[in-house]
Every structure is written in structure tokens, then in C-alpha cells.
């Protein structure tokens, strides 16, 4: 199995501006065939990011992630073998990445795409270049972290990484790490509890200091590029401390919508 964790979606009330943020700060490239009324689709040469308008009844922020596999039908069979109560649903052909949507044992939703199927659109058909700032990890905070970790290892062949100093689980496709964090209500003693689900995304960069300088430059060029403040007030301080427990990041920020992002150098 050669599964790749190469898709993430963000729902945003300011989807166009948020897309420009990732393009400007992290150098992500937009699709050569944009559909601006529907979403902003960007890529880093490996991972594709869809910034989609928040629809009625939906929350903003990280929405789902996606995995590319060699054979979708075989993968669906593996999912059923792992747990017969799990299932998948076929997606409309207009979707640029997904052939199916499915879920893990904790109902965390992910999309499935088949490699070289010809169904990929936008950057998912173009994602093949090298750039200095790339998505390094996608973090998921969920109730039954160990079982979900086993699910992604057994079904997709993601490689467990040995990090014995914390309670998290780390699985790699060889480039991107899926980080699975145990969700505990006690982690939210000094703040409003967050739902289970996607927690944050991380980038590998050539220089953290340069990212900080670029952020200042962007705000000077366009005041709408100002991101959310972190660590203010007692609850903000508690949220930041919990975020900073991720060992894969060194500098912490948000996008325009408030999605948590951490960055670290190669």
C-alpha cells in the first residue's frame, strides 16, 4: 500500500481571502483552472488544500482531510474488514479530490481518492513541484486515539512513528504525518471544551524567523491579512498552552479564519 495523506479542507466565511493568505505566506499555488465561485484550491506540490465557503448549518475551520490510495474498492474492503460497521459514500463527480467519503471508528471524516484514476481535478492533477514551505502534519484530536491509530495503520499502511515521550500517536506516509491526539475533557479545565476532530495543521519552512518577517510584511501590504491573536486573556492563554504541547511545531499562529497552524524548520 502506498497511501498518501494529501488533502485538507477548510470551511471559511472569508474563503477567498483565506486562500490568498496561504498563497501569500506559505507560497501555496492556486489551481490553473480555478472555480472561484465554488472554492479556492491550492497546493504545495504534494498536499492539496480546498478553502470552501461555509454553508448553512456548518461550522468554520478545519473540515476534513483526504487520503489518496492505489485502489479505492480494495480500501473500502479493508475498512469493512477492520470494522463492519464502518462505511463509505460515493461523492459527486464535481469534487476535485474525492471519489468517496468515509470515516474512522470515531466518525472523523476523510475523503478517498484513487491514484491515477483520471478523476482528480485542479491541483490534485497538477501537484508535482518542490517548494520551501509545505504541510508537514495534520493533527486530529479524538476520543479513542489508539484505536483510530490502528485503523489508519491497518487500512492505509501508514507507518507508526516511535515517539515514546508523549501520549499521542504519529503515522507517516513518508512525507506527511497524521498526528492523533487523545481527546480529554480535563485538557479544557481553563477554557471552553473543543469538539473532537481536526485540531491543527503544521508546516515545514526554511526559516521560522523569515515566516515572522513575512507576516509583518503581509499586514503592511494588506491589513486584511492580520491573523487572530493567540494567548490573550486567561482562556486564550490556556488554549495556546494546549496547542503548544504539539512537539512538531515551534511557532504558532492562525489563518484568517482562526485555524491553528504551527511551523517548524526542516
Which residues make up each language-model segment?
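Residue-level structural signal for beta-strand termini and adjacent loop
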Residues: 36, 54, 115, 166, ...
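N-terminal beta-strand motif that seeds the catalytic metal site of vicinal oxygen chelate
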Residues: 1-16, 62-65, 115-146, 198-201, ...
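Vicinal oxygen chelate
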Residues: 80-131, 216-266
Amino acid at each position: 500500500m502506498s497511501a498518501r495523506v494529501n488533502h485538507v479542507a477548510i470551511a471559511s466565511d472569508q474563503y477567498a481571502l483565506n486562500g490568498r493568505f496561504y498563497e501569500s505566506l506559505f507560497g501555496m499555488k492556486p489551481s490553473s483552472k480555478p472555480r472561484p465561485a465554488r472554492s479556492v484550491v491550492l497546493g504545495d506540490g504534494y498536499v492539496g488544500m480546498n478553502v470552501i465557503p461555509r454553508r448553512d448549518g456548518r461550522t468554520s475551520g478545519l473540515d476534513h482531510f483526504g487520503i489518496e490510495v492505489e485502489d479505492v474498492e480494495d480500501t473500502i474492503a479493508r475498512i469493512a474488514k477492520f470494522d463492519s460497521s464502518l462505511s463509505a459514500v460515493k461523492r459527486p463527480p464535481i469534487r476535485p479530490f474525492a471519489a468517496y467519503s468515509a470515516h474512522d471508528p470515531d466518525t472523523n471524516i476523510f475523503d478517498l481518492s484513487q491514484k491515477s484514476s483520471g478523476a482528480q481535478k485542479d491541483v490534485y492533477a497538477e501537484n508535482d513541484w518542490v517548494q520551501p514551505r509545505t504541510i508537514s502534519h495534520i493533527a486530529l484530536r479524538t476520543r479513542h486515539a489508539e484505536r483510530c491509530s490502528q485503523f489508519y495503520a491497518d487500512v492505509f499502511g501508514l507507518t507508526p512513528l516511535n515517539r515514546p515521550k508523549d501520549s499521542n500517536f504519529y503515522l507517516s506516509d513518508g512525507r506527511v504525518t497524521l498526528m492523533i491526539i487523545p481527546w480529554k475533557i480535563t485538557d479544557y479545565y481553563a477554557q471552553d471544551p473543543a469538539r473532537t476532530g481536526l485540531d491543527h495543521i503544521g508546516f515545514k519552512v526554511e526559516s521560522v524567523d523569515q515566516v515572522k518577517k513575512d507576516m509583518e510584511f503581509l499586514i503592511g501590504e494588506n491589513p486584511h491579512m492580520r491573523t487572530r491573536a493567540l494567548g490573550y486573556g486567561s482562556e486564550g492563554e490556556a488554549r495556546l498552552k494546549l496547542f503548544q504541547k504539539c512537539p512538531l511545531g515551534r511557532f504558532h499562529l492562525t489563518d484568517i479564519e482562526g485555524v491553528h497552524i504551527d511551523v517548524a524548520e526542516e
